[in-house]
């Protein structure tokens, strides 16, 4: 099934703790070239909730429960200088991992203090924060025809994965999401799955990186020739997290 099947968070089981939401906003120059100060007076948080019977609520609040779900974590980045053909990122997650997702962004687009920098509005820095191509203007066409990555290999304890000849960028952008029943992105976002059905919470395969040697477990990427900009390699991974609810308190395992 393609249903995520994620468990609900039992708020009644953490009655001795506070549930807080922390929002961190980008600088204004990240998303606009407006020079006047913009403000957000208020916003709403919309939740999907289930109301249960008092007896069930008492059971959930009074008994020990263990829930396993998947979470997304950000991996340390890697800077790649212009003209560099080969770059390696040591993979250091400390949890069982379902999927790896990575992309490349030109360094000038990463400076949140700058919003200008192009000869047209579409080539300004603020308009290209989510431009993962080698073009200076984002569009679906530029993402398709200008990928910064040529090919990639993943080495696990020195053994290369996947064990196929054609590991070019389109393998990780199109084939892996298709065979894993994931959405195929318009942007140049690359995926490798250790799970058969990564969209589902129920375990269907993973790789426990905590049991591996990080210096022999790397993402080895080959960049396109002729790139004139510096790039930053961003990698995120989806892993399993265990939550224990007991005595009104939640703890992480």
PLM features per residue range, with description:
Residues 1-253:
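Flexible assembly/topogenesis modules
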């Amino acid at each position: 099934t393609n249903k995520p099947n994620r468990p609900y968070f039992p708020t009644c089981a953490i009655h001795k703790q506070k549930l807080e939401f922390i929002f961190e906003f980008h600088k204004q120059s990240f998303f606009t070239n407006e020079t006047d100060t913009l403000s957000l007076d208020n916003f709403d948080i919309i939740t999907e909730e289930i109301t249960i019977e008092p007896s069930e609520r008492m059971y959930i609040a009074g008994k020990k429960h263990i829930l396993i779900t998947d979470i997304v974590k950000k991996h340390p980045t890697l800077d790649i200088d212009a003209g560099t053909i080969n770059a390696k990122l040591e993979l250091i997650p400390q949890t069982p991992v379902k999927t790896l997702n990575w992309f490349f962004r030109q360094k000038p687009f990463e400076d949140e203090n700058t919003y200008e920098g192009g000869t047209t509005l579409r080539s300004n820095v603020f308009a290209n924060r989510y431009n993962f191509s080698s073009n200076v203007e984002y569009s679906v066409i530029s993402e398709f025809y200008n990928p910064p990555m040529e090919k990639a290999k993943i080495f696990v304890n020195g053994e290369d994965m996947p064990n196929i000849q054609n590991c070019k960028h389109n393998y990780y952008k199109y084939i892996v999401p298709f065979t894993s029943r994931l959405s195929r992105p318009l942007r140049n976002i690359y995926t490798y799955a250790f799970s058969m059905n990564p969209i589902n919470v129920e375990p269907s395969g993973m790789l426990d990186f905590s049991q591996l040697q990080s210096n022999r477990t790397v993402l080895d990427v080959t960049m396109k020739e002729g790139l004139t900009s510096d790039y930053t390699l961003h990698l995120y991974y989806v892993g399993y997290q265990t939550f224990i609810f007991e005595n009104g308190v939640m703890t992480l395992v």
